[in-house]
Each structure stands twice: as structure tokens, then as C-alpha cells.
């Protein structure tokens, strides 16, 4: 009988598969050559809170790069970045590149054509 199960347990159980699925991102240079392949597990609220604590600010762009360094993985599951890489990434690569990776990480679909028409 299902009603004895806690609602939180039902929800957690319902998303178990999603929590173990990683999404793959090929980071390419301007000529289309793959520089690195990053893997992203789903981001939890806890991940975001930890990144915010590490960033020491409410500034969204700082937090998202901290989050990137915290959650991005190599194929074998090891971290793709060190936490100390965040400031370097923010200073030394084009904003568009960092933005694209972070939008993918957050699983945010950006429809450019629609955005331009609004």
C-alpha cells in the first residue's frame, strides 16, 4: 500500500535514474576541434548552495563558474577542474565560451531565434 511511503521518498525514488545520468559536452575551439569532453551529473540545490558558499558572494556569474568547477567531470568521473581554476577561467577565456558551458551544465535550453524576436 503506497500511502505509507513518505512523499519525499516517492519523489526521490522517481528521479533516481535521472540523478545517475550524466550529460556529455564537447568543448570545441573556434575551428571545431574538440579540446575536452566534459560530463555533467544533474545539479542539486545542495551543489548550488556549496558553490555559493565557495564563491563567497551572491553574484550569479561567480557562483556559476564555481559550480562548473565543482560538478564538471572527466569521462572516468574524476573532477575536470580544480576549484582554484574558477578565477582563471573567468579571466582568460571568452565570456561566450564560459556562458555556453554553464548554460549546458544548468540544463538551460536557449533558443536564440526566439530570444531575438521577443
Annotate each predicted stretch with a short phrase.
Residues 5, 15, 29-30, 94:
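Alpha-helical interaction segments
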Residues 31-118:
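Short, surface-exposed, charged amphipathic helix/loop patches that serve as local interaction elements
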Residues 11-12, 22-25, 51-57:
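Short secondary-structure capping micro-motifs at structural edges
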Residues 20-33:
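Short acidic-hydrophobic surface loop/beta-edge motif
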Residues 1-17:
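Low-complexity intrinsically disordered segments
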Residues 9-10, 28, 73:
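Compositionally biased, low-complexity repeat tracts
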Residues 15-23, 65-67:
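A short, compositionally biased
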Amino acid at each position: 500500500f503506497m500511502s505509507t511511503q513518505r512523499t519525499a521518498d516517492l519523489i526521490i525514488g522517481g528521479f533516481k535514474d535521472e540523478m545517475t545520468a550524466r550529460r556529455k559536452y564537447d568543448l570545441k575551439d573556434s575551428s571545431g576541434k574538440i579540446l575536452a569532453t566534459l560530463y555533467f551529473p544533474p545539479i542539486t540545490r545542495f551543489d548550488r548552495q556549496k558553490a555559493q558558499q565557495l564563491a563567497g558572494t551572491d553574484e550569479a556569474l561567480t557562483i556559476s563558474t564555481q559550480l562548473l568547477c565543482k560538478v564538471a567531470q572527466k569521462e572516468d568521473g574524476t573532477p575536470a577542474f580544480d576549484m582554484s581554476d574558477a578565477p582563471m577561467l573567468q579571466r582568460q577565456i571568452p565570456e561566450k565560451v564560459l556562458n555556453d558551458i554553464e548554460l549546458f551544465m544548468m540544463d538551460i535550453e536557449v533558443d536564440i531565434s526566439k530570444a531575438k524576436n521577443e
